[in-house]
């Protein structure tokens, strides 16, 4: 994310709903938003940037992007939610689901899948 996140870990509990003006965006919306909870942990600090891990209690559209932008730390290179932290030449978002798990809708079995960081993301971390 952009900036040096001061707390080593924390929780953002803020409802998310449609942005009142820009329909492509979501926003913190106390009145009409749905509950959204994001837990975060700092993995490494790089001065102007912070590498973080997130765990979601809810799965709202753009949840991590909205929550982090709301506390002044948008995702690096996020053109929709961050105008003040540009980062050129990224091949993808600086957001990666390392592990995702869910209960299968038919078998009711818990399933979990993991994936390594994409090369472009790992290369970026090496450059920071």
For the regions a language model picked out, list residue spans one by one.
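RNA pseudouridine synthases
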Residues: 1-128
